[in-house]
């Protein structure tokens, strides 16, 4: 290859320096449109290559037409935020134009933009106009166009050949229009498209093969489209897709079948969808996935076993700001060796299992702050010397339970508590307290619980039948996770369904009350109180608990008997293992409401009441027996008179007592000593000992407890 002499080389160098100066001088010396700015500015190509371009900036000038004295050397023309609705031929002499910005103007039709013969144009901005349709071949002259921004318009119709001629198009923004369908024929003319943003359109739905022609697409944004379902073959053909966003849709489950058709996906955004749970198979064998976002999901309650399975390149998982996410299975992750960052803050999590963390060998940082953490054996691993994991914002990690540790920092509490086993705790948001179902539908109730050792979960139906994973039934089916399925639900299936989580330490329960077509049958009452005997000054009550629903090892923190009428109310704490109660010092011929209320450690309560009237005080009537039969009529007449007088006397006495017992009883009770109930009876009460156990203990023959109501709290 011939070499230049030093003199010639110097000449060429000087010439190279002069050419840009001459170009800049020509544009600056030519007449620049009034109020516009004409200068050389940095410019980046669609491939992000740095260049310098001759730029005419006429933004924000309220222009109604394009200035007529534009230089033919113009490469970038900026006319953003004006009032231009139509062009004539002002653009025809701009043969070097590479970027044109008409965003925020008043165009209603693409033909009125005047794009003919702009063969060098690579970037076109038409966002925020009033364009309503794209007709066939409306952009066919833009053979070098690489970026088209036509988002935030009023486009409701795009013809099949609207993008014809755009074989070099790399980026297409169609988001925020009024499209109701996506037609795969649009993309036949854009085989090299790499980025497609088509979100925020009111499409009826995504169809199978919708994006099949886009084999080179790398990023697809389907955000804010109210999508409720993604068909299994909707993403077929997207073999190069690396980034996919379903942000802010209405998906109720992970579109796992569709995701399996995207083999090279690296970044997946499912944020802000009402997905209820992440379950086995949802994210499986996605061999290139690196980052997953499941944030801001208002209905997400659990991440179940093997929900994330065989994801060898996943390095970051974000599952934050999910107000109902209260459960992550200890085996939620399987074969996820590369995960480094696990973000779980601002959820409703009580704990994260140590085994979950141990299944992630490369984990470097975890964020579980701003969760209602239970400071017991389940999270002891946090203070373990075996872990080198960095906790994000550790000063924001506070105990929410047990009550004695509430508000304290987690690490301070765990130093004090070293227990290895703890009671089950059912996650409270996994299923609702009340539901109204339509006849014939299938109901799923998800019950999840955390404890050490891991609890067994079973359900009890309104009639007391126990449903386990081994139960064989056409009506009920229980998954190993704790989800109860009730098929073909009918009116007779209404009632209270109880989830029981049990381990060697005890049990926890939660109840879902199910109505069917607005109807709730009365056969589901758990606690029932009865009147066994009534006297003038006392009432003997007893109660029955459905032992199939409330197991004998369920501990209750309080149980209270309350006697109430319009004039006086008093209460008494019920002793341990009592099933009968004798209420004394009552007034005769008086109406009372008697209620038994029990509460457990989770403030769940059961209550049963009965109305009863005490008997009238007895009067003795002695009537002489006359022997003569002739006096029988007189005796009968006397008896009638006596009975009449007695009835009147009883009525007067009853009125007198009702009028005055209030003050006399108050005076009587004020003389008695006040004894706190927690000194009379133990603070922890177990009411649910089965009748069969009671018989074994020989307690069935014991006399009912005599309770002097004068020693109860006196409330007005």
Curated annotation (Swiss-Prot):
Where it sits in the cell: the answer is:
Membrane
Protein name as catalogued: Leucine-rich repeat neuronal protein 1
Q: Which Pfam families match?
A: I-set (PF07679), LRR_8 (PF13855), LRRCT (PF01463)
> Which parts of the sequence belong to the Ig-like C2-type domain?
424-515
Glycosylation site residues: 69, 96, 106, 117, 385, 517, 582, 611
CDD domains attached here? FN3 (cd00063)
- What is the native source organism of this protein? Rattus norvegicus (Rat)
Looking at the record, the residues that make up the LRRNT domain are 26-72
Residues spanning the membrane: 632-652
Provide the residue intervals of the LRR repeats.
73-95, 96-117, 120-141, 144-165, 168-189, 192-213, 216-237, 240-261, 264-285
- The domain of life for this entry's organism is Eukaryota
The UniProt entry lists membrane topology as: Single-pass type I membrane protein
Intrachain disulfide bonds: 447-499
GO CC term (a single one): extracellular space
Q: Where is the composition biased (Polar residues)?
A: 702-716
Stretches of the chain found on the membrane's Extracellular side: 26-631
């Amino acid at each position: 290859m011939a070499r230049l002499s030093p003199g010639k080389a110097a000449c060429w160098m000087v010439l190279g320096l002069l050419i840009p100066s001459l170009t800049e001088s020509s544009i600056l010396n030519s007449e620049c449109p009034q109020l516009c700015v004409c200068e050389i500015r940095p410019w980046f190509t669609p491939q992000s290559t740095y260049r310098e371009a001759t730029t005419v900036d006429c933004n924000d000038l309220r222009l109604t037409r394009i200035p007529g004295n534009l230089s033919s050397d113009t490469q970038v023309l900026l006319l953003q935020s004006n009032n231009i609705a139509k062009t004539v031929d002002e653009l025809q002499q701009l043969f070097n134009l590479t970027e044109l910005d008409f965003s925020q103007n008043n165009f209603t039709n693409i033909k009125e933009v005047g794009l003919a013969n702009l063969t060098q144009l690579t970037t076109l901005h038409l966002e925020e106009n009033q364009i309503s349709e794209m007709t066939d071949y409306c952009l066919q002259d833009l053979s070098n166009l690489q970026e088209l921004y036509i988002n935030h318009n009023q486009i409701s119709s795009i013809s099949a050949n609207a993008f014809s001629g755009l074989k070099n198009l790399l980026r297409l923004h169609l988001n925020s229009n009024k499209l109701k369908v996506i037609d795969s024929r649009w993309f036949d003319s854009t085989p090299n498209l790499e980025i497609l943003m088509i979100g925020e359109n009111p499409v009826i739905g995504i169809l199978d093969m919708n994006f099949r022609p886009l084999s080179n697409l790398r990023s697809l944004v389907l955000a804010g489209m109210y999508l409720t379902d993604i068909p299994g073959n909707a993403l077929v053909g997207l073999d190069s897709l690396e980034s996919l966003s379903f942000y802010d849709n209405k998906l109720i489950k992970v579109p796992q079948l569709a995701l399996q058709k995207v083999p090279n996906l690296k970044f997946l955004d499912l944020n802000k969808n009402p997905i209820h749970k992440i379950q086995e198979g949802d994210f499986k064998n996605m061999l290139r996935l690196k980052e997953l976002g499941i944030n801001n999901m208002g209905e997400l309650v659990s991440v179940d076993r093997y929900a994330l399975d065989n994801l060898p390149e996943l390095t970051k998982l974000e599952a934050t700001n999910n107000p109902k996410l209260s459960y992550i299975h200890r085996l939620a992750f399987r074969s996820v060796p590369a995960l480094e960052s696990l973000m779980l803050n601002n959820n409703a999590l009580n704990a994260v299992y140590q085994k979950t963390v141990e299944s992630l060998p490369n984990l470097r940082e975890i964020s579980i702050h701003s969760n209602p953490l239970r400071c017991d054996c389940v999270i002891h691993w946090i203070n373990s010397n075996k872990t080198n994991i960095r906790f994000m914002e550790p000063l924001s990690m506070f105990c929410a339970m047990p009550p004695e540790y509430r508000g304290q920092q987690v690490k301070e509490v765990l130093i004090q508590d070293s227990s290895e086993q703890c009671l089950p705790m059912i996650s409270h948001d996994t299923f609702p307290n009340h539901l109204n179902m339509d006849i014939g539908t299938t109901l799923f109730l998800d019950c999840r619980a955390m404890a050490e050792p891991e609890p067994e979960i079973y359900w009890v139906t309104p009639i007391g039948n126990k449903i386990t994973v081994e139960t064989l039934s056409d009506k009920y089916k229980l998954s190993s996770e704790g989800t109860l399925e009730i098929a073909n639900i009918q009116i007779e299936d209404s009632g209270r369904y109880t989830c029981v989580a049990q381990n060697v330490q005890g049990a926890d329960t939660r109840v879902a009350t199910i109505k069917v077509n607005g109807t709730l049958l009365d056969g589901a009452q758990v606690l029932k109180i009865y009147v066994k005997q009534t006297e003038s000054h006392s009432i003997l009550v007893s109660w029955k608990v459905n032992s199939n629903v409330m197991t004998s090892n369920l501990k209750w923190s309080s149980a209270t008997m309350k006697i109430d009428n319009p004039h006086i109310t008093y209460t008494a704490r019920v002793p341990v293992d009592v099933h009968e109660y004798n209420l004394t010092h009552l007034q005769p011929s008086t109406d009372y409401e008697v209620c038994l209320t029990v509460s457990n450690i989770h403030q769940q309560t059961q209550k049963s009441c009965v109305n009863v009237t005490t008997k009238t005080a007895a009067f003795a009537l002695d009537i002489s027996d006359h022997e003569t039969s002739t006096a029988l009529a007189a005796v009968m007449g006397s008896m009638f008179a006596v009975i009449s007088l007695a009835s009147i006397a009883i009525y007067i006495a009853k009125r007198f007592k009702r009028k005055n017992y209030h003050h006399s009883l108050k005076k009587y009770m004020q003389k008695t000593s006040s004894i706190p109930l927690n000194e009379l009876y133990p603070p922890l009460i177990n009411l649910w000992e089965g009748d069969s156990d009671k018989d074994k203990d020989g307690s069935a023959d014991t006399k009912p407890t005599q309770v002097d109501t004068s020693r109860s709290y006196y409330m007005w």
